[in-house]
């Protein structure tokens, strides 16, 4: 469980983890209620805990207002819940994206770095170098293509080729590990971890 892993790691590092519950964007408050809460709560938390506070949200609708507030308060943002340079960053930082750069990760990573440097926020935010959902689609398609062309070991899932197709789709090394839950390891279920870049 992600939250428990975060708690355990914070305990190892001597950090305090503070949980906050925002209004559910699927509730009557809607996305605007969630975003308004974040816009009010992040500055309040920085006032209480200081600028060394790092924020993480578990819902996509939280990301844009959280990034805006982190820049304004000079605090920290670990990364979007669905790691991607395209989640929250462009609108929060006012990045204009030309039509020919809409899906260009390198362009977006550079644009984010520049905007954060202008705001004296270098080192305060990060994300994966490849968008998670695009990586899943592109890498999985490339794997299916390799399978159909006989470029795998013939099994339903050739873990080495799968890792290779994901890494190529990400433009960098992707760590792939089988999911183990309750003592059972699943051959067709994976945890993946892309390269993390701190801006």
Residue ranges and their predicted role:
Residues 1-199:
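A residue-level marker of the well-folded mature domains of exported/periplasmic proteins
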């Amino acid at each position: 469980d992600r939250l428990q892993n975060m708690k355990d790691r914070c305990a190892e590092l001597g950090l305090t983890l503070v949980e906050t519950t925002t209004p559910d964007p699927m509730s009557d408050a809607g996305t605007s209620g969630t975003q308004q809460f974040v816009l009010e709560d992040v500055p309040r938390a920085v006032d209480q805990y200081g600028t060394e506070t790092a924020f993480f949200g578990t819902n996509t609708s939280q990301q844009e207002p959280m990034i805006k507030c982190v820049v304004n308060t000079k605090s920290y943002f670990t990364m979007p819940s669905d790691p991607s340079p395209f989640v929250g960053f462009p609108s929060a930082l006012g990045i204009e994206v030309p039509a020919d750069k809409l899906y260009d990760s390198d362009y977006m990573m550079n644009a984010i770095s520049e905007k954060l440097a202008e705001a004296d926020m270098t080192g305060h935010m990060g994300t994966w170098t490849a968008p998670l959902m695009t990586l899943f689609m592109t890498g999985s398609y490339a794997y299916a293509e390799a399978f159909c062309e006989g470029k795998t070991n013939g099994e339903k899932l050739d873990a080495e080729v799968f890792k290779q197709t994901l890494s190529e789709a990400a433009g960098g090394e992707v760590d792939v590990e089988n999911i183990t839950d309750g003592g059972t390891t699943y051959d067709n279920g994976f945890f993946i971890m892309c390269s993390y870049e701190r801006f």
